[in-house]
C-alpha cells in the first residue's frame, strides 16, 4: 500500500475530490482505506446493549486506495515544479 495508517491524504478523484483527512484504517487485501471525514455514509443500526435506542449513525466507508494520495507527495511535487 502506498499510504499508511495515521498519514494525511488528499482525495484525488470521486465525489469527495480535494478533501483532506487522516487515514483511520488500511484494508490491504481489498486495496481500500478509510479516511476521516471522507465518504461518510448513514448506517441504520438495531438496538443493542451498546446503543439501546438504535438509530442512524454516520460513519466513514472505505474508498479505493488509488483514489487517495499522500499530502507529503503532493507537497513534494509542488516544490519540484516550483523550483
UniProtKB/Swiss-Prot annotation:
Residues annotated as transmembrane: none
GO biological process, one term: translation
Cellular component aspect of the GO annotation: ribonucleoprotein complex; ribosome
Keyword Plastid: no
SMART domains assigned: KOW (SM00739)
Pfam families membership: KOW, ribosomal_L24
InterPro entries for this protein: KOW, Rib_uL2_dom2, Ribosomal_uL24, Ribosomal_uL24_KOW, Translation_prot_SH3-like_sf
Signal peptide: none
Protein name: Large ribosomal subunit protein uL24
Gene source species: Symbiobacterium thermophilum (strain DSM 24528 / JCM 14929 / IAM 14863 / T)
Amino acid at each position: 500500500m502506498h499510504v499508511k495508517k495515521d498519514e494525511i491524504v488528499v482525495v484525488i478523484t470521486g465525489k469527495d475530490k480535494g478533501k483532506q483527512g487522516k487515514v483511520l484504517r488500511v484494508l490491504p487485501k481489498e486495496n481500500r482505506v478509510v479516511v476521516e471525514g471522507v465518504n461518510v455514509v448513514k448506517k441504520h443500526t438495531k438496538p443493542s446493549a451498546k446503543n439501546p435506542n438504535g438509530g442512524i449513525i454516520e460513519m466513514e466507508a472505505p474508498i479505493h486506495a488509488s483514489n487517495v494520495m499522500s499530502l507529503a507527495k503532493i507537497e513534494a511535487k509542488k516544490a519540484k515544479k516550483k523550483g
